[in-house]
């Protein structure tokens, strides 16, 4: 079996979509190779793992704090490091993590090194020197430079500084894609962008999310329709903020005016000011902020709404809605990587009438809700087969 070292910024599911995607592949690939994982972790995450020893059961995972001691120097360094990482998209190298990598490489001698996420670029350059004969695989979670460009363009007029950081990110991404022996890309659309932007990229392989979600809704739950709509996601991520704002203004507020019994739950961490204002504007909108578990909301609500029309990467909330068993109205943009061709959810364009019509159909037709539930179950039964091209890379 090949010896594989996987270096990642986080694999705790609570950290978000990137971590969940990574953990899905780590679990799958640990069956075909000897896999060691080095993951950065905060003190809170280390305590979380201590309290739940089953979290990484069967996996060889080393969690490392970026800072070993809470010294005065580190208290000064931390905000500076965060500022640099925020702008460059690349984590400042920490001695504690670097030393852990050196020790593992020395004893393990990996055949393959996986650099998970562009933020680990500095650890790529370090490991490349230490493992000159190893093959390198890069895991791309988004087209980072494009997302960053979109954020800067929407937030402000491009300044010299913002242009500098955009180009910096683009160079990091180009090096990772062009120098790695293969890259795993979460979206086919991302692959198309990379090929057009960086013609010398090597092997780009589609790596659909393998995250497993526990089913929350039963078929019996669908018999009642309480007019409760749900949007789940990071409430500070610009595609979510823009999409939710459009949905509320163009679809939900008119819907709630015609039928005041409708409620919309916006569930997710770090709600942007624009999201908070939506809750203040309409009393039928509940902005929860961060919650311990989204499961009670999936259980209680009738329809999941995914109003995303921009951004790169896979939209993991599509898979989450399918896995949780909730009837869903989803933009065709968000659904494009999932091949939903058999009525597994209501896939619609960015059109207010289309969204409203889909919601009304789910409200008025128990038969439609039941049929969608059955189609979701069938889809999920066949979904989790890993791409054979990926298996070949690690055998």
Where are these regions (language model features)?
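Donor nucleotide-sugar binding/catalytic pocket of nucleotide-sugar-dependent glycosyltransferases
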Residues: 163-166, 170, 174-216
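A charged, aromatic-enriched C-terminal amphipathic alpha-helix characteristic of glycosyltransferases
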Residues: 367-395
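N-terminal subdomain of nucleotide-sugar transferases
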Residues: 1-62
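Conserved catalytic-core segment of nucleotide-activated headgroup transferases in glycan assembly
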Residues: 206-278, 287-295, 299
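Acceptor-binding helix/loop patch of EC 2.4 sugar-transfer enzymes
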Residues: 9, 71-89, 137-171, 234
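Short hydrophobic beta-strand element within catalytic cores of glycosyltransferases
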Residues: 317-320, 327-331
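Acidic donor-binding loop of glycosyltransferase active sites
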Residues: 181, 299-313, 324-326
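Conserved acidic donor-binding segment of nucleotide-sugar-dependent glycosyltransferases
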Residues: 345-353, 360-366
């Amino acid at each position: 079996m090949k010896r594989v070292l996987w270096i990642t910024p986080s694999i705790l599911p609570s950290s978000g979509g990137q971590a969940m995607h990574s953990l899905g592949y780590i679990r799958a690939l640990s069956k075909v190779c000897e896999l060691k994982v080095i993951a950065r972790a905060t003190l809170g995450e280390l305590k979380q793992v201590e309290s739940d020893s089953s979290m990484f059961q069967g996996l060889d995972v080393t969690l490392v704090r970026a800072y070993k001691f809470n010294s005065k120097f580190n208290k000064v360094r931390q905000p500076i490091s965060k500022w640099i990482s925020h702008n460059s998209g690349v984590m400042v190298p920490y001695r504690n993590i670097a030393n852990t990598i050196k020790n593992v490489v020395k004893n393990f001698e990996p055949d393959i090194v996986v650099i998970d996420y562009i933020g680990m670029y500095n650890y790529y350059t370090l490991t490349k020197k230490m493992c000159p004969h190893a093959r390198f695989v890069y895991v791309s979670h988004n087209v980072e430079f494009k997302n960053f460009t979109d954020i800067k363009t929407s937030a402000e007029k491009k300044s010299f500084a913002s242009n500098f950081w955009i180009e910096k990110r683009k160079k990091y991404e180009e090096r990772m894609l062009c120098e790695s022996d293969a890259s795993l890309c979460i979206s086919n659309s991302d692959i198309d962008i990379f090929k057009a932007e960086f013609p010398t990229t090597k092997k780009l392989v589609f790596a659909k999310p393998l995250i497993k979600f526990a089913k929350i809704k039963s078929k019996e739950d669908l018999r009642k329709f309480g007019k409760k709509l749900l949007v789940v996601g990071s409430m500070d991520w610009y595609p979510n903020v823009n999409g939710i704002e459009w949905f509320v203004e163009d679809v939900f507020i008119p819907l709630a005016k015609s039928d005041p019994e409708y409620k919309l739950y916006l569930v997710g961490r770090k709600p942007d000011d624009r999201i908070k204002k939506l809750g203040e504007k309409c009393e039928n909108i509940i902005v929860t902020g961060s919650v311990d578990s989204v499961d009670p909301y999936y259980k209680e609500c009738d329809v999941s709404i995914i109003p995303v029309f921009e951004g790169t990467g896979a939209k993991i909330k599509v898979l989450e809605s399918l896995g949780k068993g909730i009837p869903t109205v989803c933009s065709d943009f968000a659904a494009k990587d999932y091949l939903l061709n058999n009525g597994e959810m209501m896939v619609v364009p960015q059109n207010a009438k289309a969204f409203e019509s889909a919601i009304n159909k789910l409200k008025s037709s128990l038969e439609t809700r039941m049929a969608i539930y059955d189609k979701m179950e069938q889809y999920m039964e066949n979904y989790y087969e890993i791409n054979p091209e990926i298996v070949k890379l690690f055998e």
